[in-house]
Every structure is written in structure tokens, then in C-alpha cells.
């Protein structure tokens, strides 16, 4: 059975042996149905982002020209990352990974890349969009195509992503990721 990446993320965070803490990213996009500020993202406006940039707190920033306007996603050096001996977990793009790696150092940032077949990704995206009060299928398609380009084989190689996990067998994938994380702490 397949699982959504966010479900795997949650399972990893709940695994006490891994001692992972969640990093919550920031965004300027509107909150979606079912989201809570400070849980999936910190939702903020352009003014707050400008202040964080001015203070040098933004580690990485990505802007997407969406059907509804420009949405920004970013990671902030804030109260969340206090102890560099602690292990943290964050869902991000290859671009975000590269900037975090540059900011904290290659030895401190380890990518966990989970592959999901395109048809399954598209089905899930449609399902999520259907649950919105006002579905924006055009934007969903734009995001799907942008993700395909952002995570192309060439970009994975450029980012030096050498270890990948297939999102197929629930238990096996979970064990493989868990073992990989534990091996990084040795």
C-alpha cells in the first residue's frame, strides 16, 4: 500500500528512537482548508517576510507565480533550530535542501528522497484539491508540472542525491528510512 509523503513524515517524527524534531516552514500563501497556523506552516504576510529578510533570518526562500498570485515558501533561522546536536526533519524542495546544506554544512544536512510514481502523485493531488472549498485545478496542474521539473533526474544528480527510497511497501520503506537515519548518527 502506498502512503503519502506527509504520512511518512509523521511516522518518522513519532518514532522515538530517531529523536527527530519538526521544522515548520513559513509561507505567504493563504491557509487551506484543514490547515492550522504553526502546524503545517507559519502563515505570514509580505511585511513579516520583509522584516525577517532585513534581520537576516531567512535561510532559503522560493517564490512561485501561481494562478492566485505569487506565493513564497521559506525556512527561517528561528526558535525551532536551537541545538545543532539535535536531529530535525523538514519537507522541502531540492532548492531548499541545497540552501539548508550550504547554511548549516553538508555534514549536518542529510537528504531523504522518497520517490512516488507520477500517476499516484497526480491522483493524490486531485483528491486533495477536491476537498477544498474552491478547488483550483489549474493551479494543481501547474504545481504538478513544476514538481516534475524541480525534481528531474538532472536536478537530483546536481544536488548529489544518491540515496532514494521507493514509496511502495509500507513497512519496508519505513524500515529502510529509519535504518538510514540511524546510520547517519553513527
Regions found by a protein language model. Name each.
Residues 16-31:
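Short beta-strand-centered segment that lines the nucleotide-binding/catalytic pocket of NTP-utilizing
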Residues 27-88, 92-94:
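ATP-dependent small-molecule kinase phosphotransfer cores
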Residues 56-59, 127-132, 180-184:
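Conserved AAA+ ATPase "sensor/coupling" helix adjacent to the nucleotide-binding pocket
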Amino acid at each position: 500500500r502506498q502512503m503519502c509523503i506527509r504520512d511518512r513524515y509523521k511516522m518518522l517524527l513519532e518514532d522515538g528512537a530517531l529523536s527527530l524534531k519538526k521544522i515548520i516552514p513559513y509561507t505567504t500563501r493563504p491557509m487551506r482548508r484543514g490547515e492550522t497556523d504553526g502546524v503545517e506552516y507559519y502563515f505570514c504576510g509580505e511585511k513579516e517576510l520583509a522584516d525577517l529578510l532585513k534581520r537576516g533570518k531567512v535561510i532559503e526562500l522560493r517564490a512561485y507565480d501561481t494562478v492566485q498570485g505569487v506565493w513564497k515558501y521559506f525556512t527561517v533561522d528561528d526558535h525551532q533550530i536551537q541545538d545543532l546536536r539535535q536531529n530535525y526533519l523538514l519537507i522541502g524542495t531540492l532548492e531548499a535542501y541545497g540552501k539548508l546544506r550550504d547554511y548549516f554544512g553538508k555534514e549536518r544536512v542529510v537528504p531523504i528522497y522518497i520517490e512516488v510514481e507520477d500517476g499516484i502523485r497526480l491522483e493524490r493531488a486531485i483528491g486533495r484539491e477536491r476537498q477544498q472549498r474552491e478547488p483550483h485545478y489549474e493551479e494543481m496542474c501547474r504545481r504538478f508540472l513544476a514538481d516534475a521539473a524541480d525534481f528531474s533526474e538532472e536536478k537530483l544528480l546536481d544536488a548529489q542525491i544518491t540515496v532514494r527510497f521507493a514509496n511502495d511497501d509500507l513497512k519496508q520503506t519505513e524500515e529502510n528510512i529509519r535504518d538510514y537515519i540511524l546510520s547517519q548518527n553513527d
